[in-house]
Amino acid sequence: MYPAHLLVLLAVCVSLLGAASVPPQPLNLVQFGYLIQCANHGSRATWHYMDYGCYCGAGGSGTPVDDLDRCCKIHDDCYGDAEKKGCSPKMLAYDYYCGENGPYCKNIKKECQRFVCDCDVKAAKCFAGAPYNDANWNIDTTKHCQ
């Protein structure tokens, strides 16, 4: 085998090992990202909401810093209510569609799927209606969220 082939093979193996250590994104959070894009008509990338204020992103504490952060707190609380019902909101897939007026849940008969879809649609529409303040992205939560 030629040295160049060995290098390519090694690079592929290392890439696969690295990819194997990345946990898969829960399906519902991917869908939620699509709902956000639908609601805001693609005006802001989903990742802008992943580290915003005290509640947008992982965890949450304190008082929301603005209306958008309040949307995230409401969404977090809604997921908490879903968990109390025995649902797994971050893992549930559901049917939805993107219409001219934003996202909607399709005809969902299973209670958990309907509940979680409603949480996500309400939050996505709330995000679209709330102003985005760049100063509240990636804030020091130890100072602002107690």
Curated annotation (Swiss-Prot):
Residues at the active site: 75, 120
Principal location: secreted
Protein localization: Secreted
Propiece residues: 20-27
SS bond list: 38-98, 54-145, 56-72, 71-126, 78-119, 87-112, 105-117
Highest taxon in the source lineage: Eukaryota
Tagged with keyword Protease: no
Keywords from the UniProt entry: Calcium, Disulfide bond, Hemostasis impairing toxin, Hydrolase, Lipid degradation, Lipid metabolism, Metal-binding, Platelet aggregation inhibiting toxin, Secreted, Signal, Toxin
Cofactor note: Binds 1 Ca(2+) ion.
Tissue-level expression: Expressed by the venom gland.
Catalytic activity: a 1,2-diacyl-sn-glycero-3-phosphocholine + H2O = a 1-acyl-sn-glycero-3-phosphocholine + a fatty acid + H(+)
GO cellular component: extracellular region
Coiled coil: none
Cofactor(s) required, per the database record: Ca(2+)
Gene Ontology MF: a single term: phospholipid binding
PANTHER family, A to Z: PHOSPHOLIPASE A2 A2-ACTITOXIN-UCS2A-LIKE, PHOSPHOLIPASE A2 FAMILY MEMBER
Name listed for the protein in its UniProt record: Phospholipase A2 147
Organism encoding this protein: Drysdalia coronoides
Classification lineage: Eukaryota, Metazoa, Chordata, Craniata, Vertebrata
